[in-house]
Design a protein with these regions (language model features):
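Serine/threonine-rich, repeat-prone extracellular segments and beta-strand-based repeat modules
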Residues: 35-76, 81-83, 120-161, 169
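Short acidic, gly/pro-rich beta-turn/loop elements at beta-sheet edges
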Residues: 74-76, 93, 162-164, 181
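Solvent-exposed, low-complexity, repeat-rich "mucin-like" stalks and linkers
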Residues: 2-39, 84-123, 175-199
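Short capping micro-motif at the N-terminus of alpha-helices
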Residues: 26, 77-79, 109, 165-167
Length: 199
């Protein structure tokens, strides 16, 4: 009957960045120690229990298997190690466009439309999400029109595995209409009372 070795020290995995097409097979395993029935170190290899798994940021524990070189006398043994998966950066392929506003309006009145983001990893992947003004309370002047850059933040729909990204765009600001300066005066008058003057 083959014996079960004992893990005295688990191996460690190198940190990797998230990639929807990157499996655990891309994460290197190193170290680890296994001992036999007599306390001797057993040589062998560590591998992922399922190397087709795509590691994600919010899952840290993954199973590994130690396969001894002496498979005649020892069974394989399984353990669990942690993998540090880093959030991935996205690139903005096409900038969004801002709708025009009128002087006096804040950026909140300017609607952002269009724009695309992607992740350039093992394969290029389009990333879905939303664009929004970083500070939509700002009120541009007409002199800022199509010239001053304002920061827009892209928030990925998958905010767990991808970082936000910031870009800068301009906005068209038109002059506000002059207020009506004509005053409407009521020409009627009312008698509120009378007094007798001394004579």
């Amino acid at each position: 009957v083959k014996a079960d070795p004992v893990i005295s020290e688990l191996p460690v995995a190198d940190p990797i960045s998230y990639d929807p097409h990157k499996t655990l097979n891309e994460a290197s395993i190193s170290g680890g120690a296994v001992i036999g029935v007599s306390g001797e170190n057993i040589t062998g290899t560590w591998s992922w229990a399922d190397d087709s798994t795509v590691p994600v940021v919010d899952v840290t524990d993954y199973d590994v298997v130690f396969t001894p070189d002496d498979q005649k006398h020892y069974n394989s043994i399984r353990g669990t190690i942690q993998v540090n998966v880093l959030t991935a950066n996205v690139n903005i392929a096409d900038l969004p466009t801002a709708s025009a506003i009128t002087y006096g309006d804040s950026l909140a009145k300017s609607v952002l439309y269009g724009g695309t983001a992607y992740f350039d990893g093992i394969n290029k992947v389009e990333i879905f999400g939303t664009f929004a003004w970083k500070d939509d309370s700002l009120k541009p002047f007409v002199s800022d029109s199509d010239k001053t850059l304002y920061t827009v933040v892209f928030t990925p729909a998958d905010s767990v595995n991808y970082n936000t990204a910031e870009i800068e765009i301009t906005v068209n600001v038109s002059k506000a209409a002059m207020p009506n300066l004509l005053l409407s005066v009521d020409n009627t008058h009312k008698t509120v009372g009378s007094i007798a003057l001394p004579g």
